[in-house]
């Protein structure tokens, strides 16, 4: 993102994201713009290698171009996330779970939360909960469950049921089409539908907002990593 930075000077070739100056420690702009650049590189390579048709390529680019409007749509409901933050800002630990791309986003959500609020948080692959992780869940533990992918949705719902059986309070993050999450989670945050490969760009927004609002309610006034 920064022209002339150390990493740019050390690289043979550079693709700048042009996100502008990043003021916050959390660097949310850099994360979002880097995702977009990766999408564009992947689409270009898939097109050149003949892995997707011209129509699929055009549709994918169109979906990328629609992301800003969908992010704006999520931001219209930011008060809902603020409400959830007001309920859970005093938690001792908060866990994030997800599968596949949702797991990758859960890592970012957990990082942002502990980075700016200093609350202990960890992200785990939902399919590995039984390998010791579930023993950390107790009555009142907040678990943020990401379930946006169609193929793995039911499996993640099963994981939600497992942690709830241990006494967890679950905040589900899913797409508008997955209504079943409302039946198993205590709270649900919905994001607009898009191409499945682009979902991380939308899923991360409510997690970033959650970390931000928890930070306002909980954190000490001076950054520890400044």
Residue ranges and their predicted role:
Residues 7, 102-107, 152-157:
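Short glycine/serine/threonine-rich phosphate/pyrophosphate-binding segments
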Residues 11-142, 220:
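Active-site phosphate/pyrophosphate-binding segments
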Residues 128-164, 194-208:
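Glycine-rich, anion-gripping cofactor-binding loops and their flanking helix/strand elements
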Residues 218-225:
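Conserved small/polar residues in nucleotide/adenosyl-binding loops
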């Amino acid at each position: 993102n920064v022209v002339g930075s150390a990493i740019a000077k050390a690289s043979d070739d550079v693709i700048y994201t042009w996100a502008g100056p990043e003021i916050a420690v959390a660097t949310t702009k850099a994360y979002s713009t880097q995702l977009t650049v990766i999408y564009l590189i992947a689409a270009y390579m898939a097109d050149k290698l003949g892995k997707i048709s011209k129509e699929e390529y055009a549709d994918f680019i169109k979906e990328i171009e629609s992301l800003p409007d969908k992010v704006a749509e999520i931001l219209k409901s930011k008060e809902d996330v603020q409400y959830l933050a007001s309920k859970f800002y005093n938690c001792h630990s908060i866990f994030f779970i997800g599968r596949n791309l949702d797991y990758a986003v859960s890592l970012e959500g957990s990082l942002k939360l502990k980075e700016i609020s200093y609350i202990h948080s960890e992200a785990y692959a939902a399919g590995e909960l039984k390998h010791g992780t579930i023993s950390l869940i107790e009555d009142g533990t907040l678990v943020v469950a990401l379930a946006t992918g169609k193929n793995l949705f039911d499996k993640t719902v099963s994981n939600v049921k497992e942690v709830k059986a241990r006494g967890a309070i679950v905040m589900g993050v899913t797409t508008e089409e997955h209504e079943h999450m409302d039946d198993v989670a205590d709270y649900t945050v919905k994001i607009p539908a898009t191409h499945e490969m682009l979902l991380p760009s939308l899923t991360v927004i409510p997690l970033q907002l959650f970390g931000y609002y928890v930070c306002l309610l909980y954190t000490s006034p001076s950054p520890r990593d400044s």
